[in-house]
């Protein structure tokens, strides 16, 4: 059954506010430990009012993940228009993606939600994002800016490293990321730049 919601500007805005609050709470507590009343508290709503916009807590989490993936889609679109080598594209993507609140939730998708209708869409989006990153890496190898090696293995190592850094530093926005941004950029250069390797 679909939630009872008409797409009026006021209700769309309230739904977006619930999503933003949910991103914050899920990021802090995880899907299983987060409570609906924690999500609605700052919005002066009752926990039951969420069901006016979402069918369940699981449905809300799915929509949270999709909203984060949409932000990544827009970022990828912007980066693809940049006239730079592919090492710079990967560095820019990393810098911008790390400031997205809730980014680590993409790596914490509970398997218990696999029966939800949009779960397959999330996995398809994830596969597409990985494919784009791998394409950048391969093109970087072709233009001479990236080192040789298996792009999928490099991606897995980088994303895993960034996942833990994101959690340790509680990165939520540009301000909190700015403190470690130089370290991340240097790390990517050390890992992937052919120019950096030649200077050693």
What spans do the regions from the language model cover?
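Generic hydrophobic, amphipathic alpha-helix propensity
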Residues: 14-22, 39, 64-68, 72, ...
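Short coil/turn segments at alpha/beta junctions that flank glycine-rich nucleotide-binding fingerprints
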Residues: 28-32, 82, 143
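Hydrophobic alpha-helical connector segments
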Residues: 63, 74-103, 155-158, 196-200
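All-alpha amphipathic helical-bundle segments outside canonical DNA-binding/catalytic cores
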Residues: 87-91, 123-126, 142-159, 175-179
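Short secondary-structure transition hinges
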Residues: 98-135, 142-145
């Amino acid at each position: 059954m679909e939630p009872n919601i008409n797409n009026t500007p006021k209700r769309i805005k309230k739904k977006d506010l619930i999503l933003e609050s949910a991103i914050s709470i899920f990021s802090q507590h995880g899907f299983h430990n987060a409570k609906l009343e924690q999500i609605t508290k700052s919005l002066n709503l009752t926990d039951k009012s969420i069901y006016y916009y979402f069918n369940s807590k699981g449905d809300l989490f799915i929509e949270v993940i999709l909203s984060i993936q949409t932000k990544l889609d827009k970022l990828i679109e912007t980066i693809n228009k940049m006239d730079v080598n592919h090492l710079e594209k990967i560095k820019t993507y990393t810098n911008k993606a790390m400031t997205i609140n809730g980014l680590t939730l993409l790596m914490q998708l509970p398997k218990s939600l696999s029966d939800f209708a949009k779960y397959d869409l999330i996995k398809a989006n994830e596969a597409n994002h990985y494919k784009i990153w791998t394409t950048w890496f391969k093109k970087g190898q072709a233009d001479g800016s990236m080192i040789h090696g298996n792009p999928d293995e490099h991606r897995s190592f980088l994303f895993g490293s960034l996942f833990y850094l994101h959690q340790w530093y509680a990165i939520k926005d540009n301000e909190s990321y700015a403190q470690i941004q130089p370290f991340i950029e240097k790390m990517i250069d050390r890992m992937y730049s052919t120019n950096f390797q030649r200077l050693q």
